[in-house]
């Protein structure tokens, strides 16, 4: 199965899934995603990357392929710069800020709600997949790097990265200003502020309490 490389098509936010009503479709998508991950030797793959605009993806945990439906990030810790590639943007590398310790919630293909704590590479891959579901690409928000960057001095690389991080902050403030002008935007910003409180620990999230007996999917 071919991977979608049309960046315009991938810039659309994916639709949430009613697992109960769309159960057969969800199972079919999961099979297609897993087959594509195996075929191309990927760490992960989202439904939009195979031309299906639904909120689900598969992550390859050392050969154990897990399916995540309607996934969200409930809480985050830590921060680091991640060097990433994307099968939809072949031949290019990017630097992207990521949290390295996250609590997540999602549904299995059977509709069961589960929660997990992901750290390190697993956390970064999950965030990469969430970006795809939100129509956000590395080429939009990442810092593209090449041999010139690799061969630069450490001081030069730090300067480039700092300029990139400052530009991200400016973009975020511009988006927030635009959102404040609409009712929908105000509601979204209210949700963002709530999540920021969660991230700062002002509101606690207990994955064990939210999903007792969470197991593996499929």
Sequence positions of predicted segments:
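Positively charged
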Residues: 1-218
């Amino acid at each position: 199965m071919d991977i979608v490389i049309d960046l315009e098509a991938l810039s659309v936010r994916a639709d949430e899934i009613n697992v109960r009503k769309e159960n057969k479709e969800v199972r079919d998508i999961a099979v297609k995603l897993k087959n594509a991950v195996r075929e191309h030797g990927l760490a992960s793959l989202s439904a939009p990357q195979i031309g299906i605009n639904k909120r689900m993806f598969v992550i390859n945990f050392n050969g154990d392929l897990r399916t995540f439906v309607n996934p969200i990030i409930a809480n985050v810790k830590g921060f680091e710069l991640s060097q990433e590639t994307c099968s939809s943007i072949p031949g290019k590398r990017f630097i992207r800020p990521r949290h390295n310790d996250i609590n997540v919630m999602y549904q299995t293909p059977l509709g069961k709600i589960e929660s997990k704590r992901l750290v390190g590479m697993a956390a970064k891959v999950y965030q990469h997949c969430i970006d795809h579901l939100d129509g956000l690409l590395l080429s939009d928000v990442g810092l593209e790097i090449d041999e010139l960057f690799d061969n630069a001095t450490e001081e030069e690389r730090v300067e480039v990265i700092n300029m990139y991080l400052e530009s991200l902050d400016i973009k975020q403030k511009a988006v927030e200003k635009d959102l404040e002008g609409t009712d929908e935007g105000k509601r979204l910003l209210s949700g963002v502020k709530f999540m920021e409180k969660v991230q700062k620990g002002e509101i606690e999230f207990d994955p064990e309490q939210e999903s007792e007996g969470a197991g593996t999917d499929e």
